[in-house]
Design a protein with these regions (language model features):
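Bacterial Sec-dependent N-terminal signal peptides
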Residues: 1-22
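N-terminal cap/lid segment of alpha/beta-hydrolase-fold proteins
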Residues: 22-57, 464-470, 550
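Cap/lid segment of the alpha/beta-hydrolase catalytic domain
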Residues: 59-145, 194, 332-343, 502-504, ...
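Accessory cap/linker subdomain of secreted extracellular hydrolases
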Residues: 84-85, 93, 115-118, 125-128, ...
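Alpha/beta-hydrolase fold nucleophile elbow
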Residues: 147-159
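C-terminal, loop-rich substrate-recognition/catalytic regions characterized by aromatic stacking residues
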Residues: 229-232, 238-245, 321, 330, ...
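Short beta-strand/loop motif that positions the catalytic acidic residue
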Residues: 283, 289-291
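Conserved alpha/beta-hydrolase "acid-adjacent" motif
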Residues: 296-303
């Protein structure tokens, strides 16, 4: 009976949602006009641009711009779906002029596309172009040629368009008053999308670039097809693929950026030139960086772009918002949950109505009072509350190491044993999966998924505290400080921060809790919620520029940063740390032999014994940002 009621409620909500979408579509058609234009850049290349203009001529309107490599479709006369399928519709109700542009070399725009095109600081000629100069030229043309605009421009974008928003902020155009990079691609070697601390995120990279990276010899409205996967189990597909050399053969020879990845296995000047933070100096517009605590793609980018702007531009209007979201979830209609974890309210709608729209309204329309947002508006999972801070990381944190102990314990006290370690055998032929389920596409929910499946494996070390007697709140970056020894010459180290729920835990509406494949409610009692996980390719432990082998069986330090956290471990819960040496097929497998992994043969892959030391001299620990 309960399931029937839930089904009826779902169907009723679906009908209401579709009815609202139809109403929004009709309203936009009645109140907006669309035209498509080519805007010339300083080097003569023309960029295809869709412009949606309010019919209301009673006042001048601000311009909100989005530059994208993902197409400004629909092309031609149709337009309503673009403006009503997300929170664009709210800006239509505010009578914004909406401008969406295909970036250079993509879709209907002319020119050559370059991935994360490097910023040119000192431009000396018209051929010195980058995404900042293209944005400048587009804005300049728009404010001079679009009728009835008020001369104020804002730019925002999510993910790769977040990168173009970042570059817009560096354009220096005086009409650009407000910019919001959201889940911005910032650093593709250290933490965003395709590499994390030098480890290659092969699953995202291969599935994305097999389509996105295909050559586009001339402007087109037709998107490329992706790879034809014959195996729909991603673990099995990448295991059978074997090596990155084999993936390269599957990808073929036509995708330029894929070949460039292989040609630059270390953090060299080629990668450094593509660090978006290089452009974040002398920033003039008001900045609002937005990201998700559980963003699988660009969590790193949001945290670290904000910090770079803050450091390199003291005193400017630079704000940060981080909510409990997957990639771009804040632009959806629903932010009440992510995967199995519930947040107690519609966090996405709250953000749209209370932060983003008022931000642009004030700076572009002069509407309302100065939103005067807190420096950082951060949602804390665990307690499910928003908090405001005058700086990030907060001033009132204490970076406290929590130490691994014998018998799988965790303690704030340094271990006293003269010699103690825990070990496991890491076998590349049987890598640790990143999630329990069998599936094809990489899931978004792995970022807060249940880790009980990993706790049961012999190649995963698990350490946990006693039951907490009081709440423990973490706010800021986490540092893994490991003392390790290995029998090979290279290894990966995956560190996972986990919230262990009480055995009797359930949500009030647990009957409707999302289940695994096959239906049914998911058992939340004893849930091991991933709060933050990160991987470190061991050969980069001393330098990302110059990798170095391990000396077999020698104790060495492996210290690396995890992206910031904002989480409260509630009284009655436990804090758990898991350590493992594969995270498959999320990250490529380490052969556990010091080689160029992009060129490794299957014969290079070998088992290794990994030891994590926890004694008085070699005290492995995790440094946690504890709110005092």
């Amino acid at each position: 009976m309960l399931r029937k009621l839930l089904l009826l409620l779902f169907l009723f909500s679906f009908v209401l949602l579709n009815a609202q979408t139809d109403q929004d579509s009709l309203w936009v058609r009645e109140n907006y006009t669309k035209k498509e234009i080519y805007i010339p850049m300083r080097d003569g290349v023309k960029l295809f641009t869709a412009v949606y203009t309010p019919k209301d001529m009673s006042e001048k309107h601000p311009i909100l711009m989005n530059r994208t490599p993902y197409s400004c479709a629909p092309y031609g006369a149709d337009f309503s779906g673009r403006l009503t399928g997300s929170h664009w519709k709210y800006y239509c109700r505010e009578n914004y002029i909406i401008v969406i542009q295909d970036v250079r070399g993509r879709w209907m725009s002319e020119g050559e596309f370059v991935d994360v095109r490097p910023f040119i600081k000192d431009k000396k000629a018209n051929n010195d172009i980058d995404e900042a100069s293209d944005t400048y030229d587009a804005i300049d043309w728009i404010i001079k040629n679009l009728p009835n605009n008020n001369g104020n421009v804002g730019v925002f974008g999510i993910s790769y368009p977040g990168f173009y928003s970042t570059m817009a902020a560096a354009s220096g155009h005086p009409a650009l008053k407000a910019v919001s990079p959201q889940a911005p691609v910032t650093e593709w070697f250290l933490g965003d999308d395709f590499h994390h601390n030098g480890a290659f995120f092969q699953m995202d990279g291969f599935s994305f670039y097999s389509g996105f990276g295909k050559p586009r010899p001339k402007p087109t409205t037709i998107g490329p097809s992706g790879f034809d996967f014959k195996i729909r189990d991603n673990y099995e597909f990448y295991l059978q693929a074997g090596t990155l050399k084999n993936l390269a053969k599957m990808m073929g020879d036509s995708i330029k950026f894929w070949k460039e990845l292989y040609a630059h296995p270390n953090y060299d000047e080629w990668w450094k030139a593509r660090n978006a933070r290089n452009a974040m100096y002398n920033i003039k517009p008001a900045m609002l960086t937005v990201g998700g605590l559980f963003d699988a793609e660009d969590c790193y980018g949001a945290w670290n772009l904000y910090k770079a702007i803050e450091k390199q531009n003291p005193g400017i209007h630079n704000k940060l918002v981080m909510g409990p979201w997957s990639h771009g979830q804040w632009s959806s209609r629903d932010g009440t949950r992510m995967g199995n974890i519930q947040f107690g309210s519609n966090t996405a709608l709250w953000y749209q109505n209370n932060i983003e729209i008022p931000f642009f309204n004030f700076y572009l329309k002069g509407k309302g009072t100065d939103p005067n947002l807190s420096e950082a508006t951060i949602f804390f999972s665990g307690e499910n509350q928003w908090h405001n801070f005058t700086q990030w990381p907060p001033a009132n944190i204490s970076n406290q190491p929590i130490y691994f102990q014998p018998n799988g314990n965790l303690s704030w006290n340094k271990p006293t044993a003269s010699k103690s370690s825990s070990e496991y055998i890491s076998d590349p032929a049987h890598p640790v999966p990143y999630t329990e389920d069998v599936h094809f596409q990489r899931t978004a929910a792995y970022m807060n998924d249940d880790q009980r499946f990993a706790s049961r494996r012999t190649d995963v070390l698990t350490f946990q505290t006693d039951v907490l007697n009081e709440d423990l709140t973490l706010a800021g970056p986490v540092v893994a400080d490991l003392a390790v020894s290995i029998t090979g010459t290279d290894a990966d180290f995956v560190v996972k921060i986990i919230d262990v729920f009480p055995d009797d835990f359930s949500y009030p509406n647990s009957a409707g809790q999302q289940g695994r494949a096959g239906g049914g409610s998911y058992p939340m009692g004893g849930y091991q919620m991933l709060v933050r996980g990160e991987i470190m390719r061991g050969k980069f432990r001393n330098s990302f520029e110059t990798p170095a082998p391990f000396t077999p069986n020698k104790i060495e330090k492996v210290k690396f940063d995890l992206p910031d956290v904002a989480h409260t471990f509630k009284k009655g819960h436990r804090l758990m740390i898991q350590i493992q040496s594969s995270w498959f097929p999320l990250a490529d497998r380490n052969p556990q032999k010091f080689v160029n992994i992009y060129e490794a043969d299957i014969t290079d892959f070998q088992k290794a014994t990994i030891r994590i030391h926890h004694d008085a001299t070699n005290s492995s620990n995790i440094i946690l940002p504890v709110i005092k």
